Swiss-Prot record:
<feature type="binding site">
    <location>
        <position position="51"/>
    </location>
    <ligand>
        <name>Fe cation</name>
    </ligand>
</feature>
<dbReference type="GO" id="GO:0008198">
    <property type="term" value="F:ferrous iron binding"/>
</dbReference>
<keyword id="KW-0560">Oxidoreductase</keyword>
<dbReference type="InterPro" id="IPR007872">
    <property type="entry name" value="DPH_MB_dom"/>
</dbReference>
<comment type="pathway">
    <text>Protein modification; peptidyl-diphthamide biosynthesis.</text>
</comment>
<keyword id="KW-0479">Metal-binding</keyword>
<feature type="binding site">
    <location>
        <position position="28"/>
    </location>
    <ligand>
        <name>Fe cation</name>
    </ligand>
</feature>
<dbReference type="InterPro" id="IPR044248">
    <property type="entry name" value="DPH3/4-like"/>
</dbReference>
<comment type="similarity">
    <text>Belongs to the DPH3 family.</text>
</comment>
<keyword id="KW-0408">Iron</keyword>
<protein>
    <recommendedName>
        <fullName>Diphthamide biosynthesis protein 3</fullName>
    </recommendedName>
</protein>
<feature type="domain" description="DPH-type MB">
    <location>
        <begin position="4"/>
        <end position="60"/>
    </location>
</feature>
<dbReference type="GO" id="GO:0034986">
    <property type="term" value="F:iron chaperone activity"/>
</dbReference>
<feature type="binding site">
    <location>
        <position position="26"/>
    </location>
    <ligand>
        <name>Fe cation</name>
    </ligand>
</feature>
<dbReference type="GO" id="GO:0005634">
    <property type="term" value="C:nucleus"/>
</dbReference>
<comment type="subunit">
    <text>Component of the 2-(3-amino-3-carboxypropyl)histidine synthase complex composed of DPH1, DPH2, DPH3 and a NADH-dependent reductase, predominantly CBR1.</text>
</comment>
<keyword id="KW-0539">Nucleus</keyword>
Amino acid sequence: METIYDEIEIEDFTFDPVTQLFQYPCPCGDRFAVSIDDLNDGEDIAVCPSCSLMVKVIFEPEDLQEYYDEI
């Protein structure tokens, strides 16, 4: 079973249109990351690659369109 560290609103993530990743600072010093396509496919968990903590991304599917417009 997954253990979710926190729930974070999508507006609190930074979006990089080049990598198409949403990122958010992790307590370990690295960053949680999830791709816009994963979110669009219904995957709402961002994982830190360094410490494996996970956060749930809170968003509505229509929120993603403004980010797709940046790509």
